[in-house]
Protein backbone atom coordinates (compact mmCIF):
# COMPACT_ATOMS: atom_id res chain seq x y z
CA UNK A 1 0.00 0.00 0.00
CA UNK A 2 1.09 3.57 -0.66
CA UNK A 3 -0.07 6.36 1.65
CA UNK A 4 0.59 10.00 0.77
CA UNK A 5 0.21 12.50 3.59
CA UNK A 6 -0.40 16.04 2.38
CA UNK A 7 0.67 18.59 4.97
CA UNK A 8 -1.64 21.43 4.05
CA UNK A 9 -0.20 22.08 0.59
CA UNK A 10 -1.65 24.95 -1.45
CA UNK A 11 -0.70 23.70 -4.92
CA UNK A 12 -2.22 20.97 -7.08
CA UNK A 13 -0.37 18.08 -5.40
CA UNK A 14 -3.42 16.24 -4.10
CA UNK A 15 -5.36 16.68 -7.34
CA UNK A 16 -2.44 15.42 -9.41
CA UNK A 17 -1.96 12.33 -7.26
CA UNK A 18 -5.66 11.50 -7.49
CA UNK A 19 -5.58 11.84 -11.27
CA UNK A 20 -2.36 9.93 -11.88
CA UNK A 21 -2.27 7.38 -9.06
CA UNK A 22 -5.79 6.37 -8.11
CA UNK A 23 -4.54 3.47 -5.98
CA UNK A 24 -2.70 5.79 -3.58
CA UNK A 25 -4.38 6.51 -0.26
CA UNK A 26 -4.29 10.26 0.37
CA UNK A 27 -4.53 11.79 3.83
CA UNK A 28 -5.00 15.56 3.68
CA UNK A 29 -4.09 17.67 6.70
CA UNK A 30 -5.52 21.16 6.90
CA UNK A 31 -2.28 22.43 8.42
CA UNK A 32 1.38 21.53 8.16
CA UNK A 33 1.98 19.27 11.15
CA UNK A 34 5.64 18.71 10.27
CA UNK A 35 7.56 15.64 9.21
CA UNK A 36 7.00 13.82 12.49
CA UNK A 37 3.30 14.57 12.65
CA UNK A 38 2.74 13.68 9.02
CA UNK A 39 4.57 10.37 9.33
CA UNK A 40 2.70 9.45 12.50
CA UNK A 41 -0.64 10.15 10.84
CA UNK A 42 0.31 8.04 7.84
CA UNK A 43 1.56 5.20 10.04
CA UNK A 44 -1.76 5.06 11.89
CA UNK A 45 -3.46 4.10 8.62
CA UNK A 46 -0.80 1.63 7.47
CA UNK A 47 -1.43 -2.11 7.62
CA UNK A 48 1.99 -3.48 6.72
CA UNK A 49 4.52 -5.32 8.84
CA UNK A 50 7.13 -2.77 7.81
CA UNK A 51 6.72 0.98 7.35
CA UNK A 52 8.71 2.89 4.74
CA UNK A 53 8.98 6.62 5.39
CA UNK A 54 10.00 8.35 2.18
CA UNK A 55 10.46 11.99 1.21
CA UNK A 56 8.52 13.16 -1.81
CA UNK A 57 11.62 14.54 -3.56
CA UNK A 58 13.33 11.23 -4.28
CA UNK A 59 13.97 8.90 -7.22
CA UNK A 60 14.71 5.22 -6.81
CA UNK A 61 16.72 2.34 -8.25
CA UNK A 62 15.05 -0.91 -9.26
CA UNK A 63 14.38 -3.35 -6.43
CA UNK A 64 15.50 -1.06 -3.63
CA UNK A 65 12.44 -1.68 -1.45
CA UNK A 66 12.78 -5.45 -1.73
CA UNK A 67 16.41 -5.21 -0.61
CA UNK A 68 15.41 -3.36 2.54
CA UNK A 69 12.60 -5.84 3.23
CA UNK A 70 14.93 -8.80 2.75
CA UNK A 71 17.44 -7.31 5.18
CA UNK A 72 14.82 -6.81 7.89
CA UNK A 73 13.46 -10.31 7.27
CA UNK A 74 16.91 -11.80 7.84
CA UNK A 75 17.88 -9.53 10.77
CA UNK A 76 15.11 -9.75 13.40
CA UNK A 77 17.21 -7.72 15.85
CA UNK A 78 17.14 -4.69 13.52
CA UNK A 79 14.55 -1.91 13.87
CA UNK A 80 15.41 0.39 10.96
CA UNK A 81 17.33 0.34 7.69
CA UNK A 82 18.18 2.98 5.13
CA UNK A 83 19.41 2.82 1.52
CA UNK A 84 22.43 4.58 0.11
CA UNK A 85 21.28 8.13 -0.66
CA UNK A 86 23.00 9.99 -3.49
CA UNK A 87 22.50 13.56 -4.66
CA UNK A 88 20.09 13.70 -7.57
CA UNK A 89 21.76 16.74 -9.16
CA UNK A 90 25.22 15.18 -9.04
CA UNK A 91 24.74 11.43 -8.89
CA UNK A 92 28.39 10.62 -8.27
CA UNK A 93 28.16 12.23 -4.83
CA UNK A 94 26.35 11.40 -1.61
CA UNK A 95 23.36 13.42 -0.55
CA UNK A 96 23.38 15.86 2.34
CA UNK A 97 20.46 14.10 4.05
CA UNK A 98 21.81 10.84 5.34
CA UNK A 99 24.39 9.70 2.80
CA UNK A 100 25.16 6.16 3.91
CA UNK A 101 24.04 6.37 7.52
CA UNK A 102 24.43 8.59 10.55
CA UNK A 103 26.22 8.74 13.89
CA UNK A 104 26.61 11.10 16.86
CA UNK A 105 29.94 12.57 17.92
CA UNK A 106 31.18 12.76 21.51
CA UNK A 107 29.27 16.01 22.01
CA UNK A 108 25.99 14.57 20.75
CA UNK A 109 26.02 16.28 17.37
CA UNK A 110 25.06 14.25 14.27
CA UNK A 111 27.25 13.44 11.30
CA UNK A 112 26.92 11.04 8.37
CA UNK A 113 29.01 8.79 6.17
CA UNK A 114 29.28 10.64 2.87
CA UNK A 115 29.40 14.23 4.12
CA UNK A 116 31.85 16.33 6.12
CA UNK A 117 29.96 19.40 7.31
CA UNK A 118 28.59 20.82 4.02
CA UNK A 119 31.11 19.01 1.79
CA UNK A 120 29.72 15.95 0.03
CA UNK A 121 31.93 12.92 -0.60
CA UNK A 122 32.18 11.30 -3.99
CA UNK A 123 30.76 7.77 -4.00
CA UNK A 124 33.67 5.50 -4.88
CA UNK A 125 32.24 2.40 -3.23
CA UNK A 126 33.84 3.22 0.11
CA UNK A 127 30.57 2.56 1.97
CA UNK A 128 29.19 -0.28 -0.15
CA UNK A 129 29.25 -2.84 2.65
CA UNK A 130 26.17 -3.09 4.88
CA UNK A 131 27.06 -1.66 8.28
CA UNK A 132 25.53 -0.86 11.62
CA UNK A 133 24.87 2.85 12.14
CA UNK A 134 23.42 4.99 14.93
CA UNK A 135 20.60 6.61 12.99
CA UNK A 136 18.83 6.13 9.68
CA UNK A 137 17.99 9.10 7.48
CA UNK A 138 14.36 10.17 7.56
CA UNK A 139 14.58 10.86 3.83
CA UNK A 140 14.16 7.11 3.34
CA UNK A 141 13.91 4.70 6.23
CA UNK A 142 12.14 1.38 6.68
CA UNK A 143 11.16 0.33 10.20
CA UNK A 144 9.32 -2.47 11.96
CA UNK A 145 5.73 -1.33 12.40
CA UNK A 146 5.16 -3.05 15.74
CA UNK A 147 8.27 -1.53 17.31
CA UNK A 148 7.44 1.88 15.81
CA UNK A 149 4.06 1.70 17.54
CA UNK A 150 5.66 0.48 20.76
CA UNK A 151 7.87 3.59 20.66
CA UNK A 152 4.79 5.76 20.04
CA UNK A 153 6.21 6.82 16.69
CA UNK A 154 8.14 10.00 16.05
CA UNK A 155 8.26 12.57 18.84
CA UNK A 156 6.31 15.49 17.41
CA UNK A 157 8.32 18.03 19.39
CA UNK A 158 10.68 17.66 16.40
CA UNK A 159 8.72 19.52 13.70
CA UNK A 160 11.53 18.85 11.23
CA UNK A 161 15.12 17.58 11.49
CA UNK A 162 16.60 15.03 13.90
CA UNK A 163 13.31 13.27 14.61
CA UNK A 164 14.79 10.13 13.06
CA UNK A 165 17.81 10.36 15.36
CA UNK A 166 15.56 10.48 18.41
CA UNK A 167 13.50 7.54 17.10
CA UNK A 168 16.56 5.39 16.37
CA UNK A 169 18.07 6.26 19.75
CA UNK A 170 14.92 5.10 21.53
CA UNK A 171 14.85 1.89 19.48
CA UNK A 172 18.44 1.17 20.48
CA UNK A 173 17.47 1.62 24.12
CA UNK A 174 15.29 -1.47 23.52
CA UNK A 175 18.37 -3.29 22.14
CA UNK A 176 17.38 -3.00 18.47
CA UNK A 177 19.94 -2.19 15.79
CA UNK A 178 20.01 0.30 12.92
CA UNK A 179 21.68 -0.58 9.62
CA UNK A 180 22.71 1.01 6.34
CA UNK A 181 21.95 -1.24 3.34
CA UNK A 182 23.86 0.40 0.47
CA UNK A 183 22.93 -2.04 -2.27
CA UNK A 184 19.51 -0.38 -2.04
CA UNK A 185 19.92 3.00 -3.75
CA UNK A 186 17.88 6.19 -4.08
CA UNK A 187 18.52 9.76 -5.22
CA UNK A 188 17.40 12.81 -3.25
CA UNK A 189 16.79 16.41 -4.31
CA UNK A 190 16.84 17.71 -0.75
CA UNK A 191 15.68 20.92 0.90
CA UNK A 192 12.50 21.13 -1.17
CA UNK A 193 10.13 21.67 1.76
CA UNK A 194 12.28 23.79 4.07
CA UNK A 195 14.98 25.53 2.08
CA UNK A 196 18.58 25.28 3.25
CA UNK A 197 20.26 28.26 4.91
CA UNK A 198 17.01 29.91 5.98
CA UNK A 199 16.37 31.23 9.47
CA UNK A 200 13.79 28.47 10.00
CA UNK A 201 16.14 25.67 8.97
CA UNK A 202 18.98 26.97 11.17
CA UNK A 203 16.62 27.42 14.10
CA UNK A 204 15.19 23.90 13.87
CA UNK A 205 18.60 22.29 13.38
CA UNK A 206 20.20 23.98 16.37
CA UNK A 207 17.16 23.72 18.64
CA UNK A 208 16.71 20.03 17.90
CA UNK A 209 20.39 19.31 18.55
CA UNK A 210 19.93 20.52 22.11
CA UNK A 211 16.61 18.72 22.60
What are these regions (language model features)?
Residues 14-15, 40, 48, 62-73, ...:
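Short alpha-helix within the catalytic core of nucleotide-sugar-dependent glycosyltransferases
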Residues 28-46, 56, 67:
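Glycine-rich, basic loop-to-helix element that forms the pyrophosphate-binding segment
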Residues 51:
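Short aromatic/hydrophobic "clamp" motif used to bind/position activated sugar donors
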Residues 59-98, 102-109:
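Conserved donor NDP-sugar-binding/catalytic core segment of glycosyltransferases
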Residues 101-133:
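Short, flexible, basic/aromatic active-site loop/helix in glycosyltransferases
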Amino acid sequence: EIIAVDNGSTDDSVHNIKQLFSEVVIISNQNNVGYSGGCNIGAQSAQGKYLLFLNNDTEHSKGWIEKLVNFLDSHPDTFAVQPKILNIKNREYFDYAGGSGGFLDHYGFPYVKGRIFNTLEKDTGQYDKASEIFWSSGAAMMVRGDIFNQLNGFDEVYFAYMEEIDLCWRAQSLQYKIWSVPDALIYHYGKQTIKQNTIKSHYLNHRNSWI
